[in-house]
């Protein structure tokens, strides 16, 4: 199941959170959901060159808050903040309420799955070999701290007549483990031969759930009697740890002296 299902949806309410955080009645839900889709489509086209990895939409009382996670925040803000003000006005026309835009910088874009997929798509559109682009992205991700990465490309690769799928993996990518922090991203490359789809899975390590506590191993009790690691022998009917008498030891000599 972990191989086919969406990694983020599979881990919702366990280790991942929703991309839209608001509550609406059944009457207004479809309208607000449609507005969210319009906002995401608009930002995808408007900020295609700004390396935006994730968009979080929140709706407090009678306003909206949009958080952009970008590797190039200066491109989003623009000169003297002109671009960000124009962005707010356009978003307010779509949503119909005042919009606040927050920008969070992505410190390591090389291990962000969405940004990796977008980077590979841009390289494919520039006629770079898909294997070279995929392997270079994997090397950069592993070098900057990712514990595993998997990249899949599908379509008419290198202009082949028959579409096919190729994927590469390096490190661990445990898709069935719910506590695994799996970042997932998808992108499309519009080439002269057709559309090529890119999927990226990045494993950033295991994380604890909301109700989990770290398990601390209790130290083992020291057995100070006898040698360390030596098996204990109760000696049959005697006291625990006492060896039975053998021929030639002290007990045998005492019995011989008594008989004399």
Swiss-Prot record:
Pfam families (alphabetical): KH_2, Ribosomal_S3_C
Keywords: Ribonucleoprotein, Ribosomal protein, RNA-binding, rRNA-binding
Quaternary organization: Part of the 30S ribosomal subunit. Forms a tight complex with proteins S10 and S14.
UniProt name for this protein: Small ribosomal subunit protein uS3
Organism in which the protein naturally occurs: Azoarcus sp. (strain BH72)
Encoding gene per record: rpsC
NCBIfam families recorded: rpsC_bact
Disordered, as annotated region: 214-260
InterPro entries: KH_dom (IPR004087), KH_dom-like_a/b (IPR015946), KH_dom_type_2 (IPR004044), KH_sf_prok-type (IPR009019), Ribosomal_S3_C_sf (IPR036419), Ribosomal_uS3_bac-typ (IPR005704), Ribosomal_uS3_C (IPR001351), Ribosomal_uS3_CS (IPR018280)
